[in-house]
Amino acid sequence: MTENQNPEQKARDNIDALLMQAGWAVQSAKKIDLNVGAGQAVREYQTDVGPADYVLFVDKKAVGVIEAKREEEGQRLTAHEPQTEGYAAARLKWVNNKAPLPFLYESTGIITRFTDARDPKPRSREVFCFHRPETLKEWLTQSASLRARLQHIPPLNLNHVPDKELR
């Protein structure tokens, strides 16, 4: 990083470092190689609504999008969720994506929020780091997201609970 960077460039440098720590190969949209590493984070990937800051690929399939914001936007990060959702729903160039991308992030490089769009009522939550490509790959093999599976937990059978536990 140099002193002459604007806040957006500094945020992207921080995001690049966080992605690399999580096992992502960070690439420019001008030089994409989907065979490098377990997952690729492609900067400025073209969509039909404009370039997304980052599109995440696992096994050569687009699985997520990251909307980068300058650090000063940290307290308003949730206000940018509709923009991220727009990129996730957009048609990607060079990729035949029929459904919206399931994994959405907004990040300043300091604060990162994550939404699993497969949840019954998707909402973002703050995370400490980006998920690893292997984690997203595993989640995609599951029939439903964790929050969706939690909705199908059987009710507690009170006949098997001791009386003193019910007080």
Tell me the role of every PLM-derived stretch:
Residues 1-167:
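ATP-dependent helicase/translocase motor core
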